[in-house]
Amino acid sequence: LVVVNAMKNSPWATSTVVATIPIAILVGFYMRFIRPGRVLEATAIGVILLLMAVYMGSIIDNSESMRSYFDHSGLFLAWSLIIYGFIAAVLPIWMLLAPRDYLSTFVKLGTIIFLAIAIAILQPEIKMPAVTQFVDGSGPIFGGSVFPFVFITIACGAISGFHALISSGTTPKLIDNERHIPMIGYGGMLLEAFVAIMAMVAACVLEPGIYFAINSPAGVVGTEANEIISKINSWGYSVTVEQMNQLAKDVGESTLFARTGGAPSLAVGMATIFANAFGKHLLALWYHFAIMFEAVFILTTLDSGTRVGRFMLQDMLGNLHPKLGQTSWLPSIILASFIVVSCWGYFLYIGVIDPNGGVNILWPLFGIANQMLAAIALSVGTAILIKSDKIKFAWIT
């Protein structure tokens, strides 16, 4: 849903994100067949092509003949993402998932380190209040309990059940030695926490009025610009139609109103920091680079999550018929992938057509399920330690 809201009616963002798919496949073929073992070469090619994709997106956005191919509604993009998720789950891991994950790691770490340097140079003022009306359940965007929504904000930055699924299924197949686990597992979560802090800073340096104008769903604030501004001003946050129109123009978008999901507001925050530190005339380029940066690693979550879900489902189906449990049997792969994609695809569809942007449906479900998975993973880890006669380490889990 985050990716859909970032790309809808945005030819620049859509073309850039779409370009990352053939780039990842090219890198996969390069490392497997063309130049096996030449990791640095493949990395350089992939990163350069990703940066070129951002620049080419601006050319497409300014081309009347080409922009129509990438200017799509949220519903069209949702169906496209569902089809993509199915194909990604069926393809061999080396072809798309592994190179996309690998490239996204470099882009993610490089961008966040770059962002941290820019923040250190600028020392921007935090403009978001320490707490909003949401803490007492009255809004501003919607009313609801702090719990489980607090878990949404810390999901990847502190403890994540989804990461537990990936680290128990995909990651073990990619490591050579158990001694590598602390650096990958613990180091990975430290970096996730670092990413979470940088993302929070990028969002909080925006004027609250601008932040809420971007993040408020149409079902809450309306669809007309004046109606949206009036609603946000009534919450006590100052913003004007002229401000929002100018900001949209500066970042190369037709509008930024009701672009929920977090990706557009984070991209605006990151772009503002980068532009103030390294050149304001590149604001649009920074914005779409940030969108690409977010979409690339969010799509890796989609790839990995669907594949892990397929493995788990095949494992269960194997109890009904042995062939269904074979992860190399194509009919079983297709069936399990279709079921898993249908499940999350349904919620994506509901979120897209929901005038509130899925905030009352998807996000509570995510917050609850993610932490429940984490609790289960820690319980399983504790049981394994005890069974392995390593009870002295059980306090860790």
Residue ranges and their predicted role:
Residues 2-10, 28-35, 53-67, 88-98, ...:
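Transmembrane helix-loop junctions in multi-pass membrane proteins
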Residues 3-12, 26-28, 59-63, 168-193, ...:
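Helix-loop-helix connectors at the membrane interface of multi-pass transporters/channels
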Residues 11-55, 70, 74-121, 310-314, ...:
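Membrane-interface loop-to-helix entry segments
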Residues 12-19, 71-76, 136-149, 278-288, ...:
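Membrane-interfacial loop-to-helix junctions in multi-pass transporters
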Residues 71-91, 118-124, 136-176, 184, ...:
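Hydrophobic, membrane-embedded alpha-helices of multi-pass small-molecule transporters
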Residues 88, 93-100, 153-180, 184-189, ...:
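Helix-loop junctions at the membrane interface of multi-pass solute transporters
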Residues 119-135, 190-268, 304, 349-354:
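Extracellular/periplasmic helix-exit of transmembrane alpha-helices
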Residues 187-194, 260-262, 281-290, 295, ...:
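Loop-to-transmembrane helix boundary motifs in multi-pass membrane proteins
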